[in-house]
Amino acid sequence: MHAEEIYTSLQWDIPTSEASQKCQSPSKCSGAWCVVTMISCVVCMGLLATSIFLGIKFFQVSSLVLEQQERLIQQDTALVNLTQWQRKYTLEYCQALLQRSLHSGSDCSPCPHNWIQNGKSCYYVFERWEMWNISKKSCLKEGASLFQIDSKEEMEFISSIGKLKGGNKYWVGVFQDGISGSWFWEDGSSPLSDLLPAERQRSAGQICGYLKDSTLISDKCDSWKYFICEKKAFGSCI
């Protein structure tokens, strides 16, 4: 009787292999679940970081697009304003020309006020002392050039003008090339042989021509004289 109790007790205390497997399986399942959970967490963190990065980039691109749109709007506005100003200016200019033509009528003058006409040219005699280069610039400001003598008749006409006082000297547009010694007008053409300076100054400096009492003479270009400007007459009024 006592031996049976001991045997029964031993049978009760020794665990079976099936029970042992049941106890070990939960620990194995728990380890695999942890690995899966960790991988899922890493993937989620990666997706979250990617989403944040893409969100930042999208915000930056959106800001650049908005900035470019604002610049385009400003440029369009400036262009519209410029176009409107040009139209307004053109309209005002055309209206002014129309009013001028209506008021002038038959009073069309081929030369500006106080200029003297001869054929297709207008002349103005400046009675102030200037060097040749300075007088050339003064004529350019008037839309003209220094007087170019194309014929004896033209020189006689200029000499007959009452403003050309006897004895005064007036620069004209002829000068001597320092290398070749040839004479040229401002436009690059050469004077006629009978219109070359009669009295020629010999000097190391540049030599230019001036008119005195119907005679063309040469002198140093840095000397001071009066001068005569010439421009084309208005073709519609000739």
Swiss-Prot record:
Mutagenesis / variant outcome for changing Y7F: Abolishes the recruitment and activation of the tyrosine kinase Syk
Glycosylation sites (chain numbering): N81, N133
Residue span, C-type lectin domain: 118-230
Tissue specificity field: Isoform 4 expressed at high levels by CD8(+) dendritic cells (DCs), and at low levels by plasmacytoid DCs but not by other hematopoietic cells.
Motif ITAM-like, residue range(s) on this chain: 5-10
UniProt-annotated location(s): Membrane
GO cellular component: cell surface; membrane
Coiled coil regions in record: none
Function: Functions as an endocytic receptor on a small subset of myeloid cells specialized for the uptake and processing of material from dead cells. Recognizes filamentous form of actin in association with particular actin-binding domains of cytoskeletal proteins, including spectrin, exposed when cell membranes are damaged, and mediate the cross-presentation of dead-cell associated antigens in a Syk-dependent manner.
Protein name: C-type lectin domain family 9 member A
